[in-house]
Amino acid sequence: MATAEIEEIPALLKPGQTVAGLDLGTKTIGLAVSDLGLSFAHPRPVIKRVKFTIDAQVLLKALETDKVGVIVIGLPMNMDGTAGPRVQATRAFVRTMQPLTDLPFVFWDERLSTVAVERALIGMDVSRGKRADRIDSAAAAFILQGALDRLHMMRRNDYDAG
């Protein structure tokens, strides 16, 4: 499967599967994984980028270990809503990954996610060096948590309407 919409995630998951969140950077890939109840995002160690084939192999192994059924990937839109070079790079990454996995990708608007995470880490008095180590996986968790919160809101609205 190529890409999916956020609304499709529950139907795409098999029992026991989780959802992964990715924050794609030029030097690292931030990774986070949901709990089985799709309530909480948990950061995982970042993947240091080397070259695509190695990056893909390491990422797919991590996704398999965490029994991931769907991947939510941050789409770094410009503040005005237009797609810039980073969006193109993210879409190209997904296109290149698709032949390597059957896992569906869901694009999620990640505007300001890294800024929000950096502010939170500064607020927790995390040193600059430690922030650099944690920011990409924390951003992936922020992206994934946003998607999980949206799913929760959709389920609640369906329950309230029914």
Swiss-Prot record:
Described by its record, this protein's role is as follows: Could be a nuclease involved in processing of the 5'-end of pre-16S rRNA.
Record-level GO BP terms? rRNA 5'-end processing
Q: Which SUPFAM superfamilies does this UniProt record tie to the protein?
A: Ribonuclease H-like
Tell me the GO molecular function terms. nuclease activity
Q: What is this protein called?
A: Putative pre-16S rRNA nuclease
**Keyword annotations of the record:** Cytoplasm, Hydrolase, Nuclease, Ribosome biogenesis
Q: Which cysteines are joined by disulfide bonds?
A: none
Main localization (coarse): cytoplasm
What EC numbers are recorded for this enzyme?
3.1.-.-
The major lineage groups are: Bacteria, Pseudomonadati, Pseudomonadota, Alphaproteobacteria, Hyphomicrobiales
